[in-house]
Amino acid sequence: LAGQPIPPGTHADLQDARLAIPTDVVLNDLDDTVAAAFESACQRLAAAGARIRRIAMPEFAELPAINAKGTFTAAEAWAWHRGYIENRASAYDPRVVSRIQLGAKITAADFIELLAARQRWIAAVQARVAGFDAMLMPTVPQVAPRIDTLVADEAAYFRANGLMLRNPTFINFLDG
């Protein structure tokens, strides 16, 4: 990642490693830079002996519906920050506060349902990747935009923020 060669003797044995590339959602909206870097990494892994296969992962497309009533992140952030926000909201970035405050709307019943849905989702994803050693996907779909392009445009900020968080969210939800 740093553009520097890997020292000799530090390469993992990838002979016959079974790697899955999920094709649902995580490869959407890739910019040319990320797409080229990801493809290059996959080619290097394959050249080192890894067996790479693209697989459907429809469970990834289900995550927005699972999180429709709220997310773990919002609930946990609200539980931690609510006292500070109630007394010192101006010390927070307003964009961050708005997201944290979504956690206040999550009921106990919603949270318990979310826990159960997460367990079902994890089981489904684990069943789909059974037989693979790991999943491969870009961490983010695009190179991060310049901050100055987001400061004055709320829609651009939330669109970019959502894209940057999208792929890591799947792994976090898997407790990966």
Q: Model-derived features: where do they sit?
A:
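Short connector loops at secondary-structure junctions
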Residues: 51-66, 100-101
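Short helix-loop capping/hinge segments that flank enzyme active sites or metal/cofactor-binding pockets
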Residues: 13-20, 71-123, 138
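Acyltransferase
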Residues: 33-56, 82-87, 111-133, 161
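A short helix-breaking turn/cap at a secondary-structure junction
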Residues: 1-36, 40-41, 59-62
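A short glycine-threonine-serine/GTX helix/turn-capping micro-motif
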Residues: 7-8, 28-29, 68, 85-88
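Glycine-rich, small-residue loops and helix-cap segments
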Residues: 1, 106-176
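Short, well-ordered beta-to-alpha junction loops that form the rim of enzyme active sites
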Residues: 24, 57, 138-141
